[in-house]
């Protein structure tokens, strides 16, 4: 985030060489995200699955946002849309990874507030971590490695949604 703040800052006196390198690297990474998305059946911008990978997907949209600010190109926003679509149900499981939203959302996040309130539906709006492989996700409260919720995953998802709605 510090790199992005530096790049988007209007502050005078920034080091031009540092700014140029950061700009080039940011655009290169964003272009790699776009390329990887184009190679995936579900337009998911990376191949690996691991604990919290949905949070990584959400964070990639921040990279795409900054790239779009530096070098406006619809490919960045389109890839962000595809990434969010994956999170909300355009995926192998044909279901959303956000409680209360999207297609067939998770019902059993690893979250004490949702699990202990004696209400069937979980608190809405939580992004859960996701599977460890394309076909390995289970909707069980006790499965923290699949269904954990974390603030550092929620924040970039909210950011992505705000950008895409703007």
Where in the sequence are the language-model features?
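Aromatic (Trp/Tyr) and acidic
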Residues: 1-39, 47-166
């Amino acid at each position: 985030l510090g790199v992005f703040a530096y790049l988007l800052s209007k502050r005078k006196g920034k080091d031009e060489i540092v700014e140029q390198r950061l700009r080039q690297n940011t655009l290169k990474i964003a272009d790699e995200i776009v390329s990887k998305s184009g190679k995936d059946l579900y337009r998911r911008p990376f191949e690996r699955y691991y604990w919290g990978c949905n949070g990584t997907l959400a964070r990639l949209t921040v990279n795409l946002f900054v790239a779009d600010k530096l070098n406006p190109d619809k490919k960045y926003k389109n890839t962000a849309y595809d990434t969010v679509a994956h999170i909300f149900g355009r995926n192998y499981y044909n279901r959303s990874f956000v409680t209360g939203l999207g297609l067939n959302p998770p019902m059993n996040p690893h979250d004490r507030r949702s699990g202990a309130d004696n209400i069937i539906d979980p608190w809405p709006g939580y992004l859960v971590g996701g599977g460890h492989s394309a076909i390995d996700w289970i909707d069980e409260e006790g499965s923290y490695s699949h269904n954990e919720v974390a603030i550092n995953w929620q924040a970039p998802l909210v950011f992505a949604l705000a950008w895409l709605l703007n």
